[in-house]
Amino acid sequence: MGSSATATTTGESTRQQPGLACEECRRRKARCDRVRPKCGICADSGRNCVVLDKRSQRGPKKGQLKDLRSRLMLLEQRLVGQNDAPSLPQERDSLGCPTPSEKVSPEGDLVSSRASTDIGLDTCMGSTAGAFALFGSTSGSDKMPPLTPDLSTASTANSMAACICKGWQTEPAMFSTSPFPQIPLTPQSTTAPSRMPSISLAAADPIMPDVRVHPFAPMVHKRRYYAWASDPNASPARTALRSAMRTIASAMSPQFCDIGHVMYASTRRMLETQDACPETGLPWMTRLKPPHEQRKMHHERIQAWLLLAYYDVLRKSEHQAFITARRAFRLLRLSGLCEMDIDAYSGRQGDVATCTPPAETTWNMQMCSSENGADEAVLQQDWISVEERRRTVWSAFLLDRLSTMVNDQPTMLMEEAVTKPHACTFSWYFSADLPISNQFYTRLPMSEAEFQSGTQEPVSQMGFLIEATDGIKASNSIQPLPPFAHCVVVANLFARCMTHCKMAMQSPPMSAPEAHDFWIRHQWLASAAANACESTETRCDPMLVFTRILAYSASLSLCSTANATSWQTLDHHLMAMACKPAAHQAASEVVRIIKTAPRIAFFKMHPFFPNAIALVTSFLNADVPYLPSTRGGNAMDAIQERQDAVNELLAALRRSSQVNNLAAELLCKLELDIGQAASDGSIYG
């Protein structure tokens, strides 16, 4: 085709012909000759030759569509809110949130004066138009759009930080050494804004204690929390607890995980501000004060620190979690909550009467109960507040005991102290006949149904930790324990097993008396762990599932301890080998629980759940399996079964790693260990 010859210029030619190619040639990716009114290809194929003179750009730049959607959401919300909240601009100015003229991403402006203070979804969605404005629906349908505003950009995080953190401030140089981001704050030192940056976070307050926090830290009375959660004038301790609730919920919610670090820094700064007082700001007591001069120690502060420690486990490092947990443990000691029921215990145990708590602890306990004499009688009858303080104590105790699973951390809250100085041997420590005085003079938590109902105080009182721990050994008092109390007792038993392991690993080859003491402790712990495994059905409670897995993990730890110790006699070696059948049976039960658990259950498990799974995985991967069925059968089937069990446990860790940083770290470590062992041929060869 002569007309398709390339255009020539003086001395040079161009590959690109002048004009635009037709749509048919573009679709075929063919070279169009640009002949008008119909090019050669269209003429040969008999198709219409269509040429678009004005063509749009290749596509929007990155983030333009999300920015446009967010602006439409903001515009529709403002149009709907003109009738419901005419004073929205004034309230926005009082919050100190950035205005559109400051060129900040509009997601940070999604704050409604009404929805930010309400705690219920029903209140926030009082009308259909309000629901459309809440979810940014522009189509008129009742469905939530699949696309949500992008919360990962730096401008969005900065605007949210400005909205979150306005409202509390300290002296500029007070926390200059803090490793957390320095956020500009206002002169209110111990309060925080009641309005959060995201309308969804404020609206989701009612489900946060139920779905996110309560399954592993049931220390808050839900109805009372709902009563003051929407109060803009809440006390500093309650404001910090509310912020900590939202922080831990953001860590366990994929849609809010991007703003969790900002909320964490804000909540931690708020708690540090409250701790910066003469009574609690120093790691020692400068002088003893009478009760009327001491400040009241609110248990909500301890609860907030505990939630931040769990956030560190989920999203930060283990080391940071232990640092944060120690802040809560120290406040717990200063408050005197560990001695709440010392009078009841002293009446039942005569040897406890000689153990008097420090003067400052007694005074703090009095101040924790009431601020004046007029309110003391009323608060003594408020059994719900007393039970909430008990649950705060045991939540801290549970966190301390489960911390021993990570890197052999020592316990910070001592369970008991021996009254006689010469009786401080570890073999006496586990003896049921030992005269001991429990330092935790606090009753175990009651059942969840009785606590949350709040109608009438239960007639029967719960027992104490030492009684329940001995009850596991006797297998006679573990049955009536509610899930939370049962988890506390089993966690204490697991911590004893870990201490038993440390004592065996640190000592040189045992002599005959030392070996005798070792097996006395070992048999006591093995019997208690076996009874704990058989005591409670898992049902659908995440706390019960975790407790049972923890009890099985204790049996595995005892087996590993017995087989890792060098024995001088054949009898002791045979006793160590006899522990393997029970240990492998426990590992099989853990795998069965993991297989039958629904996928959603992994998002409700305790933050330390990955440690128990990793312990079982390491046991199956490192130890030669006890295979009674292979004596006359095929050993390869049993080895393949063990590989399938390891893969099932790794899959559970992989699911938990979506919301748990500890699970991701343990998964990476186990995969490296398994790969190295497989390459060396020491396991599956």
UniProtKB/Swiss-Prot annotation:
GO molecular function list: DNA binding; DNA-binding transcription factor activity, RNA polymerase II-specific; zinc ion binding
Domain of life: Eukaryota
Gene3D superfamilies cross-referenced by the UniProt entry: Zn(2)-C6 fungal-type DNA-binding domain (4.10.240.10)
Any single Pfam family the record assigns to this protein: Fungal_trans
Biased composition (Low complexity): 1-14
Region (Disordered): 1-20, 81-112
Keywords, ordered alphabetically: DNA-binding, Metal-binding, Nucleus, Transcription, Transcription regulation, Zinc
Classification via CDD domains: fungal_TF_MHR (cd12148), GAL4 (cd00067)
Any one Gene Ontology BP term: DNA-templated transcription
Keyword DNA-binding: yes
PROSITE patterns: ZN2_CY6_FUNGAL_1 (PS00463), ZN2_CY6_FUNGAL_2 (PS50048)
Main location: nucleus
Phenotype of null mutants: Impairs the production of sorbicillinol.
GO cellular component: nucleus
DNA-binding region ranges: 22-49
InterPro entries: TF_fung (IPR050815), Transcription_factor_dom_fun (IPR007219), Zn2-C6_fun-type_DNA-bd_sf (IPR036864), Zn2Cys6_DnaBD (IPR001138)
Subcellular localization: Nucleus
Job description of the protein: Transcription factor that acts as the main regulator of the gene cluster that mediates the biosynthesis of sorbicillinoids, a diverse group of yellow secondary metabolites that restrict growth of competing pathogenic fungi but not of bacteria.
Protein name: Sorbicillinoid biosynthetic cluster transcription factor sor4
Organism: Hypocrea jecorina (strain QM6a) (Trichoderma reesei)
